Amino acid sequence: MDFSDALRAIKRGKMLCRAGWNGRHLRIFMVDSTERPVKDGDAMAQRVPVGTMLGHNNHIGILAKDGTVTPWLASQQDLLADDWMIDDGGVEESFVRGSAA
């Protein structure tokens, strides 16, 4: 599928990957908006009182092999690719946090 179809699938809550990615365990998905308090020592604590709830907007995240999630931005190759796939939902051992080889 192309990126337009992939984006629609992400908005429906699907997890996706590309056949052309070198990291075969990488998946992208929608990270829902959340709120979290400013903590003492946070960079924001210099401008916002500790304990203030800050909103975090929806964004696309990428799930790495070690189980960590990072905000993701599409490259030009990702935007133009036709090899997007919806994750079949299978659980891979390699997705267990801390098991990266």
Regions found by a protein language model. Name each.
Residues M1-D5, T52-L54, A64:
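Short, 15-30-residue, compositionally biased linear elements
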Residues S4-H25, F29-V48:
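Catalytic phosphate/metal-binding cores of nucleic-acid and nucleotide-processing enzymes, i.e., regions
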Residues M1-L7, T70-L73:
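Short acidic, Pro/Gly- and aromatic-enriched capping/linker segments at domain boundaries
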Residues H56-A101:
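Short, compact, well-ordered microdomains
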Residues K11-R12, L54-N58:
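A short, compositionally biased
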Residues Q46-T52, S94:
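Generic detector of short, locally flexible boundary/turn motifs and exposed helical patches
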Residues L7-A9, T52, Q76-Q77:
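A general structural signal for short secondary-structure junctions and capping/turn motifs
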